[in-house]
Design a protein with these regions (language model features):
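Thiamine diphosphate
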Residues: 1-168, 175-177, 237-247, 260, ...
């Protein structure tokens, strides 16, 4: 992106960068489209707000992407993000290195386990915690449609990780579920013992591994669900509750979570790289027993494997 788009500089590039022969050399240009703000979250977010409100202040449609450590977003400049919502901003906030355990070795100052709880408080912020690349692509594409084509006054908060792993091809027909908040990633067999496993973000991979362990070691079949947004599931549930309350003579509607799980057998277990409160917020609409695993507490400096064992969100829990 540096070579293609360039880093913005009002005076252009006044020197020859040392890495000029590299593919991603440090290219500065007075027409550059990347703002490199440095360790200045407040200034960077103000630049993002200026671009994300340009459609109304200057009549120019811009959809900015601001990438930052997720711990240093809502926690550090939450008041400015609230102002962005109040200003009807349109754009994408990308909380990188998200999750309490994905950023191994950097301790409690950098390991985020609650940004999605904070993002849920901003009414026009649509937030997602995807695991796979195709989920991210579907979310960004739909966000562009809503903000550019439909001119909706919403902005997106999406958490992404710095962990390397293989990404499968998209599940057939999964687009709607990705956007609404959850979809069936795989279905287990027809054994008598059955469980529903919900996973989000990087911990979804631990959930997939847990399903294998349950089948091979315990004779328990598991349906695996990818939950891209507990926040959107909660909002859907609240909307349905309100509609049912205001229309007592109509046929009651069912929340999307209920629609997904009502015909499935077994207890429901959710695991994320965030605090338990994140996945617990859909409890009212989960049929049957519901157990949540999360990363409550301060972050710690250790390897991912050890961190996930410590917070009890790995495949063995």
């Amino acid at each position: 992106m540096f070579r293609q788009l360039g880093i913005y500089s009002s005076v252009g590039q006044l020197y020859e960068p040392q890495d000029k022969d590299e593919i991603m050399y440090y290219k500065e240009d007075h027409r550059g489209q990347i703002l490199e703000e440095g360790i200045n979250e407040a200034g960077a977010l103000c630049s993002w707000i200026a671009a994300s409100t340009a459609y109304s202040t200057h009549g120019v449609n811009m959809i900015p992407f601001y990438i930052f450590y997720s711990m240093f977003g809502f926690q550090r400049v939450g008041d400015l993000i609230w102002a962005a919502g109040d200003s009807q901003a349109r754009g994408f906030l990308l909380g990188a290195t998200a999750g309490r355990t994905t950023l191994s070795g950097e301790g409690l100052q950098h390991q985020d386990g609650h940004s999605h709880i904070l993002s849920s408080t901003v009414p026009n912020c649509v937030s997602y915690d995807p695991c796979f690349g195709y989920e991210l692509a579907v979310i960004v594409q739909d966000g562009m449609r809503r903000m550019c084509q439909d001119q909706e006054n919403v902005f997106y908060y999406i958490t992404v990780m710095n962990e390397n792993y293989l990404h499968p091809s998209m599940t057939k027909g999964g687009e709607e579920g990705i956007l609404r908040g959850m979809y069936a990633l795989s279905s287990g067999g027809k054994k008598k013992k059955k469980v529903q496993l919900l996973g989000a973000g990087t911990i979804l991979r631990e959930v997939i591994a847990a399903a294998e362990l349950l089948r091979e070691d315990w004779g328990v079949d598991a349906d695996v669900w990818s939950v891209t947004s507990f926040n959107e599931l909660r909002r859907d549930g609240l909307d349905v509750e309100r509609w049912n309350r205001l229309h007592p003579l109509e046929e009651p509607r069912a929340a999307y979570v209920e629609q997904c799980l009502s015909e499935r057998r077994g207890p429901v277990i959710a695991a994320t790289d965030h605090m338990k409160a994140y996945s617990d917020q859909i409890r009212a609409w989960v049929p049957g027993r519901y157990v949540v695993l999360g990363t409550d507490g301060f972050g710690r400096s250790d390897l991912r494997k050890n961190l996930r064992r410590h917070f009890e969100v790995d495949r063995y829990h």
